């Protein structure tokens, strides 16, 4: 940095964008192979290369920002804009999933029995595990904010405690979601309901796992004194990402679990009973 005449970071050539793209291709292709041919070899190869890429890319960024001093205020401003655009792109992913769900549920076709949920589908009760998951993520949003304020106030002990609580809640959410998938009476291949349900909630679950990994890295960095009260964008980005995951879950809960499953099935049952009583009269 002593020989630079500008505040920007001229990044050295890095192989990680290429290896990340190739591992994403392997992971996606492996997922297709697993779904259609019950072969998980390619998927685990993609997952392994993805994890290795994440580790080494994260290592390089930490070295550049913490030990080499390349993350100047100007660079941090660019990183903030980049993180905002990344989260915005993720928002559009979920808009697509919600669009597919509402397109199918607001005007169900005759093939679905003209009702939503489709005939033969027994939706999950939103007042059981989904409601517990909602409270868990809301609590984790409070604890991550506590961690952020503790970091800005220089309270290292409370920051570590709050971060541990957030990570624990995130892992607990993932375990409950996996149990819910295992016990569900329908699968991803059960028509448009199963597809939209598992793709939307599964993609969100993947984001929870990624966010938990992000927070674990932040916890390790805090233990090694990488963050200060004025220089902690790595943690700030993780907190933004976690709040995004929280907000998306609220929309998922209200749309898919409550309105699209439980509430719609109650309306369909009431309509059916009223029609039956009318025909009997």
From Swiss-Prot:
Component of the cytochrome c oxidase (complex IV, CIV), a multisubunit enzyme composed of 14 subunits. The complex is composed of a catalytic core of 3 subunits MT-CO1, MT-CO2 and MT-CO3, encoded in the mitochondrial DNA, and 11 supernumerary subunits COX4I, COX5A, COX5B, COX6A, COX6B, COX6C, COX7A, COX7B, COX7C, COX8 and NDUFA4, which are encoded in the nuclear genome. PANTHER family: CYTOCHROME C OXIDASE SUBUNIT 3 (PTHR11403:SF7), CYTOCHROME C OXIDASE SUBUNIT III (PTHR11403). Its main location: mitochondrion. Keywords: Membrane, Mitochondrion, Mitochondrion inner membrane, Translocase, Transmembrane, Transmembrane helix. GO terms for molecular function: cytochrome-c oxidase activity. This is Cytochrome c oxidase subunit 3. It is an enzyme of class 7 (translocase). Belongs to the cytochrome c oxidase subunit 3 family. It is found in: Mitochondrion inner membrane. One of its GO terms (cellular component) is mitochondrial inner membrane. Component of the cytochrome c oxidase, the last enzyme in the mitochondrial electron transport chain which drives oxidative phosphorylation. The respiratory chain contains 3 multisubunit complexes succinate dehydrogenase (complex II, CII), ubiquinol-cytochrome c oxidoreductase (cytochrome b-c1 complex, complex III, CIII) and cytochrome c oxidase (complex IV, CIV), that cooperate to transfer electrons derived from NADH and succinate to molecular oxygen, creating an electrochemical gradient over the inner membrane that drives transmembrane transport and the ATP synthase. The keyword GTP-binding does not apply. Residues 1-15, 67-72, 153-155, 224-232 are mitochondrial matrix. It catalyses: 4 Fe(II)-[cytochrome c] + O2 + 8 H(+)(in) = 4 Fe(III)-[cytochrome c] + 2 H2O + 4 H(+)(out). InterPro entries: Cyt_c/ubiquinol_Oxase_su3 (IPR024791), Cyt_c_oxase_su3_dom (IPR033945), Cyt_c_oxidase-like_su3 (IPR000298), Cyt_c_oxidase_su3-like_sf (IPR035973), Cyt_c_oxidase_su3_a-hlx (IPR013833). The chain crosses the membrane at residues 16-34, 41-66, 73-105, 129-152, 156-183, 191-223, 233-256. The keyword Acetylation does not apply. PROSITE patterns: COX3.
